[in-house]
Amino acid sequence: MAQALLVPPGPESFRLFTRESLAAIEKRAAEEKAKKPKKEQDIDDENKPKPNSDLEAGKNLPFIYGDIPPEMVSEPLEDLDPYYVSKKTFVVLNKGKAIFRFSATSALYILTPLNPVRKIAIKILVHSLFSMLIMCTILTNCVFMTLSNPPDWTKNVEYTFTGIYTFESLIKILARGFCLEDFTFLRDPWNWLDFSVIVMAYVTEFVDLGNVSALRTFRVLRALKTISVIPGLKTIVGALIQSVKKLSDVMILTVFCLSVFALIGLQLFMGNLRNKCSQWPPSDSAFETNTTSYFNGTMDSNGTFVNVTMSTFNWKDYIADDSHFYVLDGQKDPLLCGNGSDAGQCPEGYICVKAGRNPNYGYTSFDTFSWAFLSLFRLMTQDYWENLYQLTLRAAGKTYMIFFVLVIFLGSFYLVNLILAVVAMAYEEQNQATLEEAEQKEAEFQQMLEQLKKQQEEAQAVAAASAASRDFSGIGGLGELLESSSEASKLSSKSAKEWRNRRKKRRQREHLEGNHRADGDRFPKSESEDSVKRRSFLLSLDGNPLTGDKKLCSPHQSLLSIRGSLFSPRRNSKTSIFSFRGRAKDVGSENDFADDEHSTFEDSESRRDSLFVPHRPGERRNSNGTTTETEVRKRRLSSYQISMEMLEDSSGRQRSMSIASILTNTMEELEESRQKCPPCWYRFANVFLIWDCCDAWLKVKHLVNLIVMDPFVDLAITICIVLNTLFMAMEHYPMTQQFSSVLTVGNLVFTGIFTAEMVLKIIAMDPYYYFQEGWNIFDGIIVSLSLMELGLANVEGLSVLRSFRLLRVFKLAKSWPTLNMLIKIIGNSVGALGNLTLVLAIIVFIFAVVGMQLFGKSYKECVCKINVDCKLPRWHMNDFFHSFLIVFRVLCGEWIETMWDCMEVAGQTMCLIVFMLVMVIGNLVVLNLFLALLLSSFSSDNLAATDDDNEMNNLQIAVGRMQKGIDFVKNKIRECFRKAFFRKPKVIEIQEGNKIDSCMSNNTGIEISKELNYLKDGNGTTSGVGTGSSVEKYVIDENDYMSFINNPSLTVTVPIAVGESDFENLNTEEFSSESELEESKEKLNATSSSEGSTVDVAPPREGEQAEIEPEEDLKPEACFTEGCIKKFPFCQVSTEEGKGKIWWNLRKTCYSIVEHNWFETFIVFMILLSSGALAFEDIYIEQRKTIKTMLEYADKVFTYIFILEMLLKWVAYGFQTYFTNAWCWLDFLIVDVSLVSLVANALGYSELGAIKSLRTLRALRPLRALSRFEGMRVVVNALVGAIPSIMNVLLVCLIFWLIFSIMGVNLFAGKFYHCVNTTTGNMFEIKEVNNFSDCQALGKQARWKNVKVNFDNVGAGYLALLQVATFKGWMDIMYAAVDSRDVKLQPIYEENLYMYLYFVIFIIFGSFFTLNLFIGVIIDNFNQQKKKFGGQDIFMTEEQKKYYNAMKKLGSKKPQKPIPRPANKFQGMVFDFVTRQVFDISIMILICLNMVTMMVETDDQSKYMTLVLSRINLVFIVLFTGEFLLKLISLRYYYFTIGWNIFDFVVVILSIVGMFLAELIEKYFVSPTLFRVIRLARIGRILRLIKGAKGIRTLLFALMMSLPALFNIGLLLFLVMFIYAIFGMSNFAYVKKEAGIDDMFNFETFGNSMICLFQITTSAGWDGLLAPILNSAPPDCDPDAIHPGSSVKGDCGNPSVGIFFFVSYIIISFLVVVNMYIAVILENFSVATEESAEPLSEDDFEMFYEVWEKFDPDATQFIEFCKLSDFAAALDPPLLIAKPNKVQLIAMDLPMVSGDRIHCLDILFAFTKRVLGESGEMDALRIQMEDRFMASNPSKVSYEPITTTLKRKQEEVSAAIIQRNYRCYLLKQRLKNISSKYDKETIKGRIDLPIKGDMVIDKLNGNSTPEKTDGSSSTTSPPSYDSVTKPDKEKFEKDKPEKEIKGKEVRENQK
């Protein structure tokens, strides 16, 4: 392809399309057709040439073609792509160089390509204004569509739109043709959309179709046209469609699982949700007198009782009457109840009956399969599921919580996250593909360049030489170049040669200058002229300096790394104009919000041995940050511009020669069009924005620069930012006048400080350079806004400006790497998400308009159905804004409530369709793409902002200086003391000194290495400053040497960096000897160039291992630390004699006790018992005296046992070991708590508040179990490893949220108060109460009350935001915000409507981004941890992994004995029938049919229906029993050796029992129909038989793989729930029952607490549980409420404890555990997909062994050689070797044992090798494999190969040759001896036979002479294989002769 592309670039490649061209094409096409033989005309697509991707229609013309001659713009040209040479196409290029491809056939049969009409149409079509016009029309049209009640004149506008669209389509049809050929109008799917829209428009206009609004909604599709017009969107939509295709498997699995769960739900809860509490009929009614007869069943046909007195009572009518149901306040639906003991009970005077409709308008139910499915889908998406959960538990009983646990964990967490995993994978694949494409292009361009170079080498050598000398004769040349850059940019044949010569000269000049350069400016040189040229060329091709891939160049030679100081003495930042780095390296190199002071362009590799140089007084420094790519691009290009101007400027001239040399590299390749601004702007900038007027000014400037750029000033400014943030966060309501004036003054002061900083920086740097940098622009904007705000302080309505001050918080990112990284990730994602966000916006827009058009009217007309007052509810679709809000709410995952409303007013089907579409398309796909992008930007940024950490920022420098100062003072004081008191020689210690070790100076710079100073980096962790963590580099003259010595701010490398900082934190016991110290030093040194990541903890240290694995030699360690012993020498006791020895023996005894397994088991048992005991302390404990007493004693016993354990461990391990182990500390603290409460009880202080709260800490006891259970410990360790980064992200999120919280306080503080009626609890109308004073006037009956969760201060704001971010309780907050007016004013309904947008913005940034970041961090961390502790995986190549996995699977299997076929003829027939695959599949079909019949069941089906279904069920039971009997007959007792059969057997027995004892079972157990549901599990078996189900198998495989890990996480979650349940019971058992707390869901007992906590695990309904706890004083609660049976008084909660309890639980469970779950699933999913993508899967090996069983019925593991061919042919692909396969099998060289048998492993190994191909690693693996196989199958020990198939064949062939020759010899002998009397003819006849034999043997010989066979063997089996069998070969080389003789005759006979 590359070859074909090499049309000479420039105008020559463009040729106008003429009649001749058309004729030529036709001729070529005819020739090609003639050339091809018939057969080859349909060759496979693989080998067909493909169109060039760079010349596709819609792309821009590659740069290599140069400019289009003006006369050829918008004209038909011959196709540039060689692929289309013989196809009838032509191209047209517009001014923007976009390619349009057309068919060269006649359009509409009349317009030839050269027809003037068609030419005009083409000109219009390709013109950019045309697409602009269409774009504007679409947007305007969209605006008109959002009008809910359009005025009449819009009708005419509609016609205009239709007209424009029609015109567009006509133009397209005229230009392209309609539909027959390629590239015609209807060949583009996007045009189908246009076409249908236009047709619909005309149809609706002229034909009356009744429901017009439904059809008018089709106009909405016009919005989709934007996608086809905006270029980037098509690709995103492509990606979306791809991910939806990938989702098909997950979707099927999801639907299947949901169906199964829905069936279970249907069987368990059918009709339950209609159980209501109905009033017991009044005593005087006829009912009372007849109750007995009713219950005895005497009732006439219509449900009426007839009795003696003849008064009638209709029971059905009575219970159908809504007014008799018990309804709680504020609820729409009556209270549900159940008749089970653990179900909800009715109040006094009420009875539980099944009547009325289901809850929520009748839409929440399990009565039919479809409603059950909807309920399950809702559970899976976790929308308002707490409501379903509570209703079901209330109606059916608490035990059914198990059902919900299963559905939530398997359905919700697993399936939803699988969808995420699939989308992320699809995204990743797409990314890979684009990267590969880019690489491929690069290679092609390289090739082109090579070609160009060759073409142009010879032609113009002379001209070029003269040109070069002229060009570089002076600066003038540069100026000219600037002017003529458009010429220079063309890669015309002339310029290419010139480059080379110029470059050579320049090279030599550079070498000379480079050695004697005085100003210290270093230019990294690139290695070869070619590479420079190619790179620069590539750059200009893309116009994107970042496309260079990592391979392109090493960090050392970024093409043009030009120092800022070239341009002016003030700037010493290295800004490279073009830095070619790969994506990964680019991150954080120089950046947007960052100053580019130490933005060195070398990477960490080159940092290591760099020179350290101080910076000059005149240069500015600052901290480093990071840039987005576009920014870098802009800045680079702009700096290129500047450089040119600067050169023209006088100050730059003296250096010009050296610069010129480098600049010209890129000069010719940069087009003028790429300049950011016109040249006049730079001239203006030079004069007005760079202030260099006089010397005095320069001095002032210099001074200001010194001050402003000092790190201490930076530190001060950072402190000011923090203080300012604090001041802003201190606003609250109500605030005193004094406090508020303090805040105002503070604000003024800070504004002043920041303004001064900005002004000084501008003076120091000049405006021109000041605004070159992201951070400074940011500062400038904020300062200007603050000043504006001061000016406009008193203007009403501009308080919004105050919110901009909050952005100052972001300045912290300068010195806080994690925040910086986060902003960067969000920045990157927003860049990548730009298109996605547009697509999302289009989707939201379309659905909002559709909703408005379809349902708007219905909401208006049927509003009384959903609202008693007949007012529109808050969520409706009557206008565009509200419609948009509903769609947005659905995207947040809350769809069910709004859908109920919609279904009630507008009918079920349409609403279901629309809402499901929004839910599936919007929510699942788009939000998951969000996540996928976030995750991918994580992996590319590698979370740890490595580059940032490696650069020191000013803050660290300042802190470092302070640290040094303090150290200096400390050392001085120490020395004084030493001199005064100790006259000893100094011992050299490892310490942080400040001595300079070495100081080498030469003519270029100095390298200084200092001892390390410890700095706290941004995370508060100590990190050594040095190789690993931070390095800066400067280049200096030697005269700067002194300034260096005097400048203490420099940091320098030390050989061990991170290592030393680790020493600081090590425990002393870790190093028992010097050598160990040395070793660890080396170790640490090896890791010292750690990534500097926030996560990267030191490598696991010896101490940790010591803690986990007890010493082998059973010797206790020292009791005390060395420090203690030094200070108190008496602690050291001699263990050799006397008391010391007794003490030592005692310790040894204790040690052996503690280390004993039984001791540990006993302690675990005690821990479990004591934890269990806590669960009994509920509110009923007072009434159960015996239990209470028992528990008190037990508590004491447990406490004593634990104290004893602790003492034993102290004696055994010594204090040092005990107290350096974190788990021991945990034990210690928990024991202390028990001890304190014991002592307090003994002393009678048990009622003290402090003691009571201490007792609640006993809830932590179960934590001790953590260290004892391996599984949980693994998870905890992983979590602890993740804590630093989770904390980091949590902090960043808090900062992020702080901004929204402060903004919320500014907007809503004090405005949520409202006046309520104390009797009814309703809010007063605005007519009655307008403000606070009106409310006061009403006295007792009114109350001025605040919403519980509000924005009155920043803390409350945080809680409110957490509720919004988790979408729980957010409605109330939003309603309050939307209704609010001002402080002390009564709210009005939707007064402040657009406040919704505050929440929308917060949800997007605060919730989607930040909460997903947690997932990102955890997954990222997970991977990092795996890498750190991971096993071989990381050190294996991909190849090796493939083999390893195949082998792993291989080794674990072994052939089994098949079930023998019965000898009895009848049994044998049945056996054959049962073992066929068809039988299996038919049974599966029966199971599915059974499932369908179960789905048909409904709650209120007719008796006849019930009868039919039970008969059908009977049939199924008979069939399944039949299957069972058949299998039993044929398989005999072997039936029970297969797990699945036992399962079938149990199900069949249960079904039969269930059929006969249905009533009995239903009464005491569950509904017997459930047994039939269980049978569905068998469907799992069928998946193996279906080839197409591979995807689903993968998903299930992923689940199986994740189960162990998920079980561990589940255990941990249970532990957390347990602790919180105990804690909740002791704190919230008695709170007032309201909101989410009622008689069933509360913290009164352990069970109830667990039920509540399980619900909050998914963060569902936590607002409801928190609300009652926030009641802290009357009138919200009653502090003196009496609780019968208990001594506790009052039902008030404790808000601070409550908030802490719920927030911490949500963070732990929801963010951590649930996200760990996600991480595990994503991980295993990718592993599983890799597995399934491997050439050999688990199933292939299983299949191999299944076939093997038939050939080896006795499971000997051997097969005879003669059967091998049939065996190979019986396998399935990929292992299959079809017949004829003899030769192949022989060539495999398989080892054989006596009896010509071959072992299964050898065959499998050879076949596997055949599939996987050659590899050198096979030997080692093979040996490994055999070991494993031996271990699992001891029978193979006897296996000693004697020969191999190949050897056997060679033996056979050689035997044949020997025999033949021997026969010939015998014959000759005979001929000699035989007398001549025999006739010659007979002799002829005799000889004939051998001759025939010869021929046969010759043939064989030809096929397999030794050489040939060897050749073929080497192709099918690698030499490595031989090496394994070589020893064997030698072994049986000896036996060969005898064997041959033995075997000869036998074989001959066989032949």
Curated annotation (Swiss-Prot):
- Which parts of the chain are II repeats? 693-965
Description of post-translational modifications: May be ubiquitinated by NEDD4L; which would promote its endocytosis. Phosphorylation at Ser-1452 by PKC in a highly conserved cytoplasmic loop slows inactivation of the sodium channel and reduces peak sodium currents.
Consequence of changing L1507N: 12-fold decrease in activity of the spider RTX-VII toxin
Where located?
A: Cell membrane; Basal cell membrane
Keyword annotations from UniProtKB, A to Z? Cell membrane, Disulfide bond, Glycoprotein, Ion channel, Ion transport, Membrane, Phosphoprotein, Repeat, Sodium, Sodium channel, Sodium transport, Transmembrane, Transmembrane helix, Transport, Ubl conjugation, Voltage-gated channel
> How is this protein positioned relative to the membrane?
Multi-pass membrane protein
Q: Which InterPro entries match?
A: Ion_trans_dom, Na_channel_asu, Na_chnl_inactivation_gate, Na_trans_assoc_dom, Na_trans_cytopl, VGCC_Ca_Na, Volt_channel_dom_sf
Function, as annotated: Pore-forming subunit of Nav1.3, a voltage-gated sodium (Nav) channel that directly mediates the depolarizing phase of action potentials in excitable membranes. Navs, also called VGSCs (voltage-gated sodium channels) or VDSCs (voltage-dependent sodium channels), operate by switching between closed and open conformations depending on the voltage difference across the membrane. In the open conformation they allow Na(+) ions to selectively pass through the pore, along their electrochemical gradient.
Protein name per UniProt: Sodium channel protein type 3 subunit alpha
Instruction: Write the gene name.
Output: Scn3a
